[in-house]
Amino acid sequence: MSRVALYPGSFDPVTNGHVDVVRHAVVLCDQLIVAIGVHPGKTPLFPAGERLAMVRSVFAPVAEKAGCAFDCTTYDDLTVAAAQKAGATILIRGLRDGTDLDYEMQIAGMNETMAPGVHTVFVPASPGVRPITATLVRQIAAMGGDVSAFVPQSVASSLKTKFAG
């Protein structure tokens, strides 16, 4: 039986924290699907197509190195519904701290009620990436700060281009 996991998020932009979660996730499953949430009420910094390309270029080599099949997609419905549509039985969620855990436990409980066959697996962030959030990365980049310690090099370049001029 193939273990399919879905790792949902906005990935706006991809951070080293996301990469850390993927490095742990690819050893837990046979196929990892990264699902980018597209929400009508939100205006992301990077459009969905750019985020898909970013996710693919950063995460596919990590999955390949681990021998894990990889795919990425977008979704605009409930995360648990996206998992079911993708045939995933595992939802991967990264945890930075206790606040994340409290929030994610509530969601995991609701998801378990809606889709008993989809199980949430929490991946604790490595100490070096715990403080990183995409929101802070966007703010630092928007103010001309150096984000190279917080994101993959290709993402740092994309952010620099996005905020140039």
UniProtKB/Swiss-Prot annotation:
Q: What is its main location?
A: cytoplasm
- Keyword set, alphabetical order: ATP-binding, Coenzyme A biosynthesis, Cytoplasm, Magnesium, Nucleotide-binding, Nucleotidyltransferase, Transferase
Pathway involvement of the protein, from the record: Cofactor biosynthesis; coenzyme A biosynthesis; CoA from (R)-pantothenate: step 4/5
Site (described: Transition state stabilizer):
H18
Q: Which GO terms describe its molecular function?
A: ATP binding; pantetheine-phosphate adenylyltransferase activity
Return the EC number.
Answer: 2.7.7.3
GO biological-process terms attached to the record? coenzyme A biosynthetic process
Q: Does the keyword ATP-binding apply?
A: yes
Kindly state the subunit structure of this protein: Homohexamer.
> What is the protein's known function?
Reversibly transfers an adenylyl group from ATP to 4'-phosphopantetheine, yielding dephospho-CoA (dPCoA) and pyrophosphate.
What is this protein's name?
Phosphopantetheine adenylyltransferase
Name of encoding gene: coaD
